[in-house]
Amino acid sequence: MAVQQNKKSPSKRGMHRSHDHLSAAPLAVEPTTGETHLRHHVSPNGYYRGRKVIKTKND
């Protein structure tokens, strides 16, 4: 089992964690409807990459 030799100071601990922050989810704009949606996901209107792939209630 691994055991640390020396205690890591709060400064070094913070530097180690500095890249663990969350980033904003990348959004894409649907070319057909102009809606924003998560990348690689179907838009709320049922469009994906310019094509209708899911029937919605409005159809």
Swiss-Prot record:
Transmembrane segments: none annotated. GO terms for molecular function: structural constituent of ribosome. It comes from the Bacteria. GO terms for biological process: translation. It holds the Pfam family Ribosomal_L32p. Residues 9-19, 49-59 have a biased composition (Basic residues). Keywords: Ribonucleoprotein, Ribosomal protein. The keyword Ribonucleoprotein applies. Belongs to the bacterial ribosomal protein bL32 family. This is Large ribosomal subunit protein bL32. It comes from Cupriavidus necator (strain ATCC 17699 / DSM 428 / KCTC 22496 / NCIMB 10442 / H16 / Stanier 337) (Ralstonia eutropha). The gene is rpmF.
